[in-house]
Amino acid sequence: GDKELVAKETGKENPKVLSAGPEDTVFTYFMDHGSDDIVCVGGEDVSSSQLMAALKTAYEKKLYGKWVWFMEACHSGSMFGALPKDMNIYVITSSDGDHNAKMTNCPPNDVIGKENMATCLAGLWDNFYLDYVEQHPDCTIGEIFDAVHADVAKSSDQNVSEFGDLTFRDFKLSEFFGTLPAPSFRPVKMEKSTTTVPVSEVPKHLAMWRAIRADKSELAEAMKKYQEEVFKNAKKEVVLMKLGRALMNEKAADKAFKTAAETYSVD
């Protein structure tokens, strides 16, 4: 990539750019927040059309040979719906375009060494895929997708998805990811958490558990924070319903608000 141009456009002194060529394999693991057709990058939103334009430029300038993306974000599938199958790019997303991603190992399943971490320790999708790769270091990309898609579906509707050149399914992940440590250095299989929380609800969930775990000296402040999070969610619901009410009748707005995007019909 053009480091000087990126520095000029972003104002960053030493920006990271893709330094690869037509003989190189590239692996990108992206994790941040997302919504319909956007993901957050460095505090700013990047649209699906902007991402597609960047990938097209990289392809035309031969900045890579084969490129694999793993993206963890809500509605991450909405970023790659227009990805051509002939650009030597393959993508796995933690969710499709209609669903939020889920977090896992959240309170009360956030204990490490008998200590409560007071946070969600992993995304549901990346927890499954990293665990699978640890246990199957010689696996193909297709094996990862099939196994993780099935595992995630047991506890979430986020629908792990794949895009791009599906012939990449036959490649071993090690071709992009590198060689993992010897089996004796890899951890034993983790017990999966039964607690999953939509990313958008994590702040409220953490605030609730902070209040639950608070002692007398901390309880008032913890309850205040929890009430603030509950109010934020309630305010967002009311604003969305008022907008829906302005565009359609109240019953239709209520139906739209409560129905999953992939099953909703205006009829």
Give, region by region, the residue ranges found by the protein language model.
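Cysteine endopeptidase catalytic domains of the caspase/legumain-like
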Residues: G1-D267
